[in-house]
Amino acid sequence: MKKRKFWGWGYEDQLLTEEEDKSIERRIAQNFSLDEVKSVPIPKAEEIELPKSRVSIPSNLSEVLTEDHLERLNHSYGKSFPDIARSILGIFPSPPDLVAYPKSQTEVESTLDWADQNKIAVIPYGGGSSVCGGVETDVGDDFRAVISMDMRKMDKILEIDKESRAARIEAGILGPDLENQLKEHDLTLRHFPQSFEHSTLGGWIATRSGGHYATLYTHIDDFVESTTTVTPSGVIESRRLPGSGAGPSPDRMIIGSEGVLGVITESWIRLQNRPTFRSSCSVHFSDYAQALNATRLISQAALFPANCRLLDANEAMFNGAGDGSKHLLIINFESADHDMQPWLDRALEIAKSEGGEFELPKEKDAHKSGASGNWRNSFIRAPYYREASIRRGIVQDTFETSITWDKGYEFIETLKRRAQEAIKEITNRDTTVTCRLTHTYPDGLAPYF
């Protein structure tokens, strides 16, 4: 496996270009009226001391467990702002005592049995992209030790049911590997969270991750057909069903459980044919309330665009998709079966009725060019820009929620204003709080700040 940065996002060889680094420094200097922008050096693993592991590896798990220094560093934190800041500064007070790399469900069961008998906490670990503290190994004093169980060696597609268009897939598979293996069968999952490159199927299920689709199939829930989860008390395995009305759903218990109930080892996942028809357009609005209303009307028209993301003017500007004067609505339709242009035409009619301005793109791959393409590229690169900013002393973080349409506009405007006031009070500096809608529903929206 490729070596990951223990102090930031991605692999060790994934660094910003020199020009990207300089661009970030120029922006920081301009925004904060600085003559010079200093950077904290990238930490070296060998210079960081860790407390000694509190347990020894049993002989029957010697091929599964390791106490390697770099592995313990890599599995101490997720990728939130506090996580990256502490990693860059070399602060690792509570690393895992051991790291497990199971290659089968049997090895997961054996590790959990040993841990349960010896009062050792086990934290499931996928790609380590968590920003909510889910993989942090500080568990307090109730356990003798901590194991971080990295699932990435369980990374195979075990079975494909083409007739039902579903596949049985191990939980440790990373997003790119999943799509590459499905591509051989002309199938796709098309679940693309921002962490796609460095997150796993099991992680998506455990966190109920939101993905590529802004409407309809918005979260991993919509693709999960069944799950298999190993717990200290046994295995929970749900049945493959297209739908069920028979009482509480065991999958609903596992999806979003954040690893507290057990280790997800595999899942049957609903798939799709690879899209061949695409229709896209970017719409600009001068008035945010009108832009929000256009987004609502499109969401309630049963058109179900794959992408229906509204960026406020500053969010668009920071992502290279505008100059800060207009709000931007990115609309994209896709299908493996039929031309989507009529759906796009209707969505644009709705947007125009609310003051939206647009020019129909001439390029075949319009979703990869122009304002839409700029935002797409910035979206993927954003975590790398953030870690570079953190090394230069910038506090940069995000938060999100969901709310019904009747409260949406007032909520967004009030939250942005109050966040700016709070930051001003604490730092005595002006700041910018931006917003984009990640998902939209007939009855509400999901703003991301």
Q: What positions do the PLM features span?
A:
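N-terminal flexible segment immediately upstream of the FAD-binding catalytic core
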Residues: 1-113, 131-165, 313-322, 370-398, ...
